[in-house]
Amino acid sequence: MKTTFLDFEQPIAELEAKIEELRFVQDDSAVDISEEIERLSKKSQQLTKDLYANLTPWQVSQIARHPQRPYTFDYVNELFTDFHELHGDRNYADDLSIVGGLARFNGQACMVIGHQKGRDTKERALRNFGMPRPEGYRKAERLMRLAEKFGLPIFTFIDTPGAYPGIGAEERGQSEAIGRNLYVMAELKTPLIATIIGEGGSGGALAIAVGDSVLMLQFSTYSVISPEGCASILWKSAAKAPEAAEALGLTAHRLKALGLIDKIVNEPLGGAHRDPKGMAAMLRRALADSLRQFQGMSINDLRQRRFERLMSYGKFKETTPGA
């Protein structure tokens, strides 16, 4: 698949286009231009390194939304075996913006739950652009309860702009469904490891992200509101989104410094979409390390640790003036 480049990546896109053109010429010519191709490839790689070493929060937001970024099912295919999808909330409907089912991770039975966006127009509409309705969150709750019953660890993958704000969703209890999930996750008697793989949009993300360990991919985001939404409220213009992204502190490094996430999983050069298999390999190691941390821990110790972790959120430090 041809890589889609973002606006700020245009210098890289131009170099890559030149490289592709030279490769095409080389295939149809006796002239050896391999040295020039190698030189331009190194230049492109260095340019990518320099660009990605100095990303703004707004640019990170764009990468988190990249249309070719791996979604939940991509990671399911790479990280898990024997996946069997489970459907429906047993109350109203089956919301396809949240997917989940039984699987094995490194041979161990587990439950997998995650947001799922679409790759084309038809699938995006089918998945509601990754914005769950109440029945999606109730499906997630059902699967969490099932995992708890059989003592299975839970892996969740977060990638949503937010919970769907439609009238029907509100009528069916959107806020209640999210709130109930927060309560359920806080009380679960089995480990839950959450990973933010793209957009972590407000309560829509939090509803499957209250974990014993929260991981975050290097170029993903996690925030109470989108930069555009924040800008529209504060400055009455979505054009101020870059400033809003800076103020929101939505990047992995900022959230790690605040203690809101536990680990940052580095991405391949250029983002997860440039090397999905490489990204999956790095994430596999991080998930295995996190799961190992909770194996052998008693239920009481697990829940007490989770409680203390949740209670630590929002604490602040007092400093002397001028410190």
From Swiss-Prot:
Enzyme class, top EC level, equals transferase
- Family annotation (PROSITE patterns): COA_CT_CTER (PS50989)
- Gene Ontology annotations of biological process type: fatty acid biosynthetic process; malonyl-CoA biosynthetic process
Tell me if Lipid biosynthesis is a UniProt keyword of this record.
yes
The record ties this protein, via Gene3D superfamilies, to:
2-enoyl-CoA Hydratase, Chain A, domain 1
Q: Which pathway, per its entry?
A: Lipid metabolism; malonyl-CoA biosynthesis; malonyl-CoA from acetyl-CoA: step 1/1
Tell me which InterPro entries the record gives: Acetyl_CoA_COase_a_su, ClpP/crotonase-like_dom_sf, COA_CT_C
* EC numbers, comma separated: 2.1.3.15
Q: Which GO terms describe its cellular component?
A: acetyl-CoA carboxylase complex
Q: Which GO terms describe its molecular function?
A: acetyl-CoA carboxylase activity; ATP binding; carboxyl- or carbamoyltransferase activity
Q: Is Lipid biosynthesis there in the keyword field?
A: yes
List localization entries. Answer: Cytoplasm
Q: Which reaction does it catalyse?
A: N(6)-carboxybiotinyl-L-lysyl-[protein] + acetyl-CoA = N(6)-biotinyl-L-lysyl-[protein] + malonyl-CoA
Positions of the CoA carboxyltransferase C-terminal domain: 39-293
Q: What is its main location?
A: cytoplasm
Q: Which UniProt keywords apply?
A: ATP-binding, Cytoplasm, Fatty acid biosynthesis, Fatty acid metabolism, Lipid biosynthesis, Lipid metabolism, Nucleotide-binding, Transferase
Q: By its UniProt entry, which PANTHER family does this protein fall under?
A: ACETYL-COENZYME A CARBOXYLASE CARBOXYL TRANSFERASE SUBUNIT ALPHA, ACETYL-COENZYME A CARBOXYLASE CARBOXYL TRANSFERASE SUBUNIT ALPHA, CHLOROPLASTIC
Protein purpose: Component of the acetyl coenzyme A carboxylase (ACC) complex. First, biotin carboxylase catalyzes the carboxylation of biotin on its carrier protein (BCCP) and then the CO(2) group is transferred by the carboxyltransferase to acetyl-CoA to form malonyl-CoA.
Q: Which family does it belong to?
A: Belongs to the AccA family.
Q: Which NCBIfam families match?
A: accA (TIGR00513), AccA_sub (NF041504), PRK05724.1 (NF004344)
Q: How does it assemble?
A: Acetyl-CoA carboxylase is a heterohexamer composed of biotin carboxyl carrier protein (AccB), biotin carboxylase (AccC) and two subunits each of ACCase subunit alpha (AccA) and ACCase subunit beta (AccD).
What name goes with this protein?
Answer: Acetyl-coenzyme A carboxylase carboxyl transferase subunit alpha
Origin species:
Paraburkholderia xenovorans (strain LB400)
